[in-house]
Amino acid sequence: PATGQDLVLRVNTGSQMHLPDQIAYEFAALTDLLPTGRTPRPLFYDDSRAILPYGALVMTWLPGRHLRYEEDMGAAAEILADIHALPVPENTRLLRPDRPAGSIYQECLDMAGRYLAWEGADKTACRLLEALIQEVGRLPLGDPSPAPPAIVSTQLNSGNFLINPGERSYLVDWEKPLVSEPAQDLGHFLAPTTTFWKTDVILSPANIGDFLRRYATAVGGRFDLRSLAERLPLYFTVTCLRGVSWCAMAAVEYAQPGRVLTNADTQVKLGQYLSEDFLEHILETYVRRDFLRGVAL
């Protein structure tokens, strides 16, 4: 622009939430989140599709590098605490699932189902996906939560954090925000299917316990954390299923001719996540046993 200000133009080619006005939804989310000081400022959006065949959003550019799990967990805890402490605006248009964990599980069934019905699916991957679906389906996915509502990102891989050591850090890529409970974000952030996506890191129980203590300190009593110990293991486990189910769906999409967007690194990760070794590891380590047992705030 004439001002010389660095801006970001986001062009949306589809909606993972199946919304007819995806770019307007993202604009609304960023508007709600503005008081946190942790997200881009939305400037305007155009969903007319008069010039481009897609919706477009302009927002401020923010500095920072991607999160490093080995050294940036304190910064991540502070970012998430500030976002989760934001009172949900009464007039928010963000979706609010009645039973968020159950909604995630249903999404997993839909995504994995596409792979299970695909003629190119690997038989071993299908067997293990079906086992994961069956085991996770036994969890109390429909239980109501006593946790206070919060705006959650639902997309907390390391590449969506902008870290500035010693200065303010940020969270970007607000494509799929919801009104839910903080445990949903924390379960997603800490799950191996998230940390391993852009890095080779899988967090230990000690790593997770240290992060949760930092998060509680950063929250500083701004909202009630008493239900977190009960709700976090549920979201942690269902997120593991969601991670591999998403990869299964993406493998089908990447195999389609004429796909608009592709990424070589993503294709490599899809193969890793759908391998027998990785799926077995998720099933035995994170689903068939309580990986977070003994981890406390």
PLM regions: where:
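Short, flexible, mixed-charge acidic loops at enzyme active sites
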Residues: R49-V58, Q184-L186, A251-Y254
